[in-house]
Amino acid sequence: MKTKHVYRVLAVSLLGMLLGACSVFETSADSIELGANEAVQIFTDTIDGSEIFLDQSAGYLVFPRALRAGLGIGAETGEGVLRIDGKTVDFYRVTSGSLGLQAGAQARSMIICFMSEAALESFRNSSGWRVGVDGSVALIDVGGGKSIDSQNVRDPVVGFIFNSSGLMANLTLEGSRFTKIVR
């Protein structure tokens, strides 16, 4: 019983140090913008149809590097941009937490597309938009085909999680919170 408590305290302490280290070094607007440009380039280079998908959206979030780490208790954080008509209009932070069997760290990129003006406005007017509470995000998994067709997507908000190798499968954004930040 006492050993479990020690492990929990250790896990929470390590997680706090990991995420604290991420937030100590505030990322500059230029650095976030550069990372977002690179993430969009990787996305459009590796997934056929993605450029058309971005063009048809009312706006989209780009998180070039979201760090997920955990040891029993997990957390994720990252900073990104909201783009409308391909231009950055605001900066955002994503955060989430989870409990369960997990150990390690992973960096990933995310693009979340608002396919309607109503979905985009709902997001922009919130003070901290939470997936599963304020709206849902349909994650797109293209499998081995590495192509997407925007004509078949009917969801108002769709997300893509990827790394330099392409889209990543079996992931979730449930419980993630997106908060506007000043840069």
Which residue ranges define each predicted feature?
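Bacterial N-terminal signal peptides that target proteins for export
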Residues: K2-A11
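C-terminal motif of bacterial Sec signal peptides marking the signal peptidase cleavage site
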Residues: L18-A21
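Small-residue-enriched, tightly packed secondary-structure blocks
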Residues: S23-R183
